[in-house]
Amino acid sequence: MSKKSGLSFLWLSAVAFVVDLLTKYIVVQKFDLYESVNVLPVFNLTYVRNYGAAFSFLADHSGWQQYFFILLALAISGMLVYFLAKNNAEQKIQNSAYALIIGGALANMVDRTYNGFVVDFFDFYWDIYHYPVFNIADIAICIGAGLLALDAFKSEKKKVQDKQVEKCGQK
């Protein structure tokens, strides 16, 4: 009997993908470009177009970056699907991380492929400082990265504990 692989976590990719594209669709349908609706004293919903990557990285270049980010999203997603296939389903944190990153990367890739830009709309600010505007896909990618860091920390802690137990057993 074979064990379930990490591919069973791809439902999480699908959720991140669909929720991201649905929220972007709603923003594009309901907002004019740069229109902003105040939600909280530190938070607006603001429709912006991002021609680069996170924090508008490479946004001011001649257009080659669009193809670069599409290829990068495909390559990373393919690599992470491979890792999911190799992982055991019991590796919940790592599998969840990979799945969230895949969903976010592919959602932004579809947006970039279809529109030539990524729709961003979460706008947090304090006084005159505005954090870069972002979307659900960005959140999924960041949570995935955070989970990978957490998993690495937990794995390292377990290695240290295993060594301590091993030393105690040798005495």
UniProtKB/Swiss-Prot annotation:
Is Protease tagged as a keyword? yes
List the catalytic residues. Answer: 120, 138
KW rRNA processing (keyword) present = no
Where in or outside the cell is it found? Cell inner membrane
Where is it mainly found? membrane
EC annotation from Swiss-Prot or TrEMBL: 3.4.23.36
Report how it sits in the membrane.
Multi-pass membrane protein
Q: What InterPro entries does the database record attribute to this sequence?
A: Peptidase_A8
Q: Quote the catalytic activity from the record.
A: Release of signal peptides from bacterial membrane prolipoproteins. Hydrolyzes -Xaa-Yaa-Zaa-|-(S,diacylglyceryl)Cys-, in which Xaa is hydrophobic (preferably Leu), and Yaa (Ala or Ser) and Zaa (Gly or Ala) have small, neutral side chains
Which one Pfam family would you cite for this protein? Peptidase_A8
Q: Which GO terms describe its cellular component?
A: plasma membrane
Name the UniProt key words of this record, in alphabetical order: Aspartyl protease, Cell inner membrane, Cell membrane, Hydrolase, Membrane, Protease, Transmembrane, Transmembrane helix
- GO biological processes: proteolysis
GO function terms (MF aspect): aspartic-type endopeptidase activity
> For this UniProt entry, which segments traverse the membrane?
8-28, 64-84, 96-118, 133-153
Pathway assignment: Protein modification; lipoprotein biosynthesis (signal peptide cleavage)
The record's listing under NCBIfam families reads: lspA (TIGR00077)
Q: Which family does it belong to?
A: Belongs to the peptidase A8 family.
Cited function:
This protein specifically catalyzes the removal of signal peptides from prolipoproteins.
Tell me the protein's name.
Lipoprotein signal peptidase
Source organism (scientific name): Haemophilus influenzae (strain 86-028NP)
